[in-house]
Amino acid sequence: LACRDRNRIALESDLLSAAMLGIDNILCLTGDHTKMGDHPQAKPVFDLDSVSLLHTVKLLESGVDLGGNELVGEPPKFSKGAVVSPCSDSVDAQLAKMERKVAAGAEYFQTQAVFEPEKFIKFMEKAKQFGKPVQVGIIIPKSAGMAKFMNNNVAGIHVPDEMLEELKADK
């Protein structure tokens, strides 16, 4: 559930609708700026970020909405996930974000696509302090062009030059 395209009222509505439909796994993410996507002229919303969305989920689970109104019926219960970029240039910044997300209620993490296993292993050595499961993101690039596109347009993903060269050679 990305915060980029919806305000808090819409996000809360999406969460309550998901609960009514029996969807109980929620991956909370801020989302990339619209300039990075295929509609760069669109205005992003970003009323909430991933941490405040996790807080919102916990609030709904307590039986209260963002307006302070009590929910009717049984409050929803979600399995709350968040995103982390283990191959980021700033591992310490990612760990600090991870800590804030855990404090906000994240129960598991999904990584951005990992193309540098050594960096991922080093990250996980530090991230294990949080005691939360981490699911590694895997993308198999179909071409050098796809890998280059991800490097240029997808935040938190870096396909190493060596892999780009291998993909170019595998035409």
What are these regions (language model features)?
Residues 7-15, 33-54, 60, 64-69, ...:
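Active-site-adjacent beta->alpha loops and helix N-cap segments on the catalytic face
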Residues 96:
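Active-site loop of classical SDR/Rossmann-like NAD(P)-dependent oxidoreductases
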